[in-house]
Amino acid sequence: MAIEIKVPDIGADEVEITEILVKVGDKVEAEQSLITVEGDKASMEVPSPQAGIVKEIKVSVGDKTQTGALIMIFDSADGAADAAPAQAEEKKEAAPAAAPAAAAAKDVNVPDIGSDEVEVTEILVKVGDKVEAEQSLITVEGDKASMEVPAPFAGTVKEIKVNVGDKVSTGSLIMVFEVAGEAGAAAPAAKQEAAPAAAPAPAAGVKEVNVPDIGGDEVEVTEVMVKVGDKVAAEQSLITVEGDKASMEVPAPFAGVVKELKVNVGDKVKTGSLIMIFEVEGAAPAAAPAKQEAAAPAPAAKAEAPAAAPAAKAEGKSEFAENDAYVHATPLIRRLAREFGVNLAKVKGTGRKGRILREDVQAYVKEAIKRAEAAPAATGGGIPGMLPWPKVDFSKFGEIEEVELGRIQKISGANLSRNWVMIPHVTHFDKTDITELEAFRKQQNEEAAKRKLDVKITPVVFIMKAVAAALEQMPRFNSSLSEDGQRLTLKKYINIGVAVDTPNGLVVPVFKDVNKKGIIELSRELMTISKKARDGKLTAGEMQGGCFTISSIGGLGTTHFAPIVNAPEVAILGVSKSAMEPVWNGKEFVPRLMLPISLSFDHRVIDGADGARFITIINNTLSDIRRLVM
């Protein structure tokens, strides 16, 4: 019998299929992953709702899909069904020997993540899901890092005790699992028979844990993530270290119990430094049963794997060629790559099926830093005459305090540095007469208040409309330059970003189709989005797709400033504080409200004459807003 397999409830948005994990003819178990999909904010694997044989695959990599879409057709495998009664009979006969296991509820708590509270940013499972040990359950984010919280044991999700946006800390209850109880009578019997043969306890040995290859520089220990007595799994993070340009977690090279900690927060370490001593189990006793002997090579192979991994990574360090295939990485790794400004297409993945791991991104960043430092000395490249950043001990001159930069400041700082260095900026300054505009705006606000429209019209919406009109007349300003500097992408839509000052730093929400919206509609949208920005609730989609940016700091003062172009855009408008000034009208000086504006643009795309024409269009439109209806 044919069974249709459809996408379960994944929300309203369409997602892209990035990987198909089965092929026609495969026998599939219930809950086995079928496809991987990725949206704007996360990627996930879609599991099979039941067992069967893949008869048809209705989708391909790159297709868009959504909740309820048909992805595959399964054959229920009648042959297997015929054999089922016989198997059932055998199971029934065997049943008295082992009573069914009783299910028990177990709490799942946040492991030791330090003393600070963190925010739940994503819940990766739902009630009813069968979860394996070490499978990721939630994603949490603090001031300095984000991480996925794994399941400490296998089970079925019975209750979820947290929501996205909740604050949690070490020990917080996040879920309740239903887990299988003790096995029946047969299991103890088997254990008792095996016990005499393997009575001698395995001998414990002591092994040193050293810092792996992190480059030649010393780094500072910023966090110790385990304590004496902790049982640690291989690859579990032990400490966090931070250098001048990056931070990383140092993983355990093997499993064991922490016997001694050799470092403290604030200590300096480097490649090869001793950080801990582990107590590890020795070889299994010689009298172990034959079954155990047959399985013994597996741990040995697993122990060898970490040793082979650095070699693979070392080979990959020089292989940063562009990867045209789809990049396989979890949302956590993608976020890490965004924070470091890493193009994942250039990173070679060493995980299963080429998946990019945290270590791959860290290796790429480390190699990129080494190349950047070596390039000026080796080739005379870099910025001519650029000196290294001065190292000054400020504490010699008086009392100091060091304050960590916010997450937004760190990200935007790197972007601004790149934009300023890579884009040849030219800035035109002008003043526009907004006397009539301001009179009209105040009149409209009074009318809106009388009619209880619950809207406040600001000068920014008129500037947005004036910019949209200029972009329609001069489409070269509504473009982006290709990475190789050889082509322009001309956009047929007009989306304008407006910089908003928030307690956490500057953010730039994007307003879509400004040329198609009226003043009232834009005013309402500006009020709503600005509030979301200040509350820190903007989504990624609300900050993407911009064509041109407006940075208005007139409310804070200043007469002129030169804004930095927001790549990959090619121009930005700065708006300063308006003031009454005497203006000559041909007969006499009259008081007029003048607004200083400044247009910065990429000189590779726009020449000075076009820059002057563009700012003049804005000037003329704001001076006589009747032009907006022409």
Curated annotation (Swiss-Prot):
In short, the EC number is: 2.3.1.12
Give any GO molecular function from the UniProt entry: acetyltransferase activity
- Return the cofactor note field: Binds 3 lipoyl cofactors covalently.
Per the record, residues carrying N6-acetyllysine are: K396
SUPFAM superfamilies associated with the record: CoA-dependent acyltransferases, Peripheral subunit-binding domain of 2-oxo acid dehydrogenase complex, Single hybrid motif
**Which GO biological process categories is it annotated with?**
pyruvate catabolic process; pyruvate decarboxylation to acetyl-CoA; pyruvate metabolic process
Catalytic positions? C547, H603, D607
Which residue stretches belong to region Hydrophobic?
Answer: 373-389, 542-567
Catalysed conversion reaction: N(6)-[(R)-dihydrolipoyl]-L-lysyl-[protein] + acetyl-CoA = N(6)-[(R)-S(8)-acetyldihydrolipoyl]-L-lysyl-[protein] + CoA
Q: Where is the Lipoyl-binding domain positioned along the sequence?
A: 2-75, 105-178, 206-279
- Subunit arrangement? Forms a 24-polypeptide structural core with octahedral symmetry.
Entry-linked NCBIfam families = PDHac_trf_long, PRK11854.1
> Which family does the record claim for this protein?
Belongs to the 2-oxoacid dehydrogenase family.
Q: What is this protein called?
A: Dihydrolipoyllysine-residue acetyltransferase component of pyruvate dehydrogenase complex
Report the source organism. Escherichia coli (strain K12)
